[in-house]
Amino acid sequence: MVRVKICGITNLEDALFSVESGADAVGFVFYPKSKRYISPEDARRISVELPPFVFRVGVFVNEEPEKILDVASYVQLNAVQLHGEEPIELCRKIAERILVIKAVGISNERDIERALNYREFPVLLDTKTPEYGGSGKTFDWSLILPYRDQFRYLVLSGGLNPDNVRSAIDMVRPFAVDVSSGVEAFPGKKDHDSIKTFIKNAKGL
């Protein structure tokens, strides 16, 4: 069964509802320019209230390794999602301490080939935008298909919502799906009906 990550969590109510609805992971965005930014202090207050076996993921964009690891330890993260232009050497350095998920923006086949350079890590494919994710826009999922089996753990993101997630999963066969804007009432606040429907459709329940 595909795993589901609800990203852009900014409050405890949304985090707990996501988990109770069947989310496998929640994501905190530590990129200050994001509309869904959360401070490490607020993220920690949410993290410590979550039940065990829920994956806590921190999203960073072109951040210093020491800062990433400090925040990861403080917030009690299980993984970090590197959503910028991080070179593979930096990813490997951080991966010595915590699980790394490398996000790559996709707009054409060359981007898929670039993503393959990171396939030693779980790779998240997102729609390429200047804002580094959270755009609500999809990319052409068929670009993935010739390369699908070269990714060990593929996470699909970018414009997913309750209406299209099932067809995306059926086409791409990802290990996990990641959603943020597709289940929002507005940036930073989730729509609970959308979360419930998204998870139900993703998991085929």
From Swiss-Prot:
GO terms for molecular function: phosphoribosylanthranilate isomerase activity. It catalyses: N-(5-phospho-beta-D-ribosyl)anthranilate = 1-(2-carboxyphenylamino)-1-deoxy-D-ribulose 5-phosphate. InterPro entries: Aldolase_TIM, PRAI_dom, RibuloseP-bd_barrel, TrpF_fam. Pathway: Amino-acid biosynthesis; L-tryptophan biosynthesis; L-tryptophan from chorismate: step 3/5. Keywords: Amino-acid biosynthesis, Aromatic amino acid biosynthesis, Isomerase, Tryptophan biosynthesis. Belongs to the TrpF family. This is N-(5'-phosphoribosyl)anthranilate isomerase. The lineage of its organism: Bacteria, Thermotogati, Thermotogota, Thermotogae, Thermotogales.
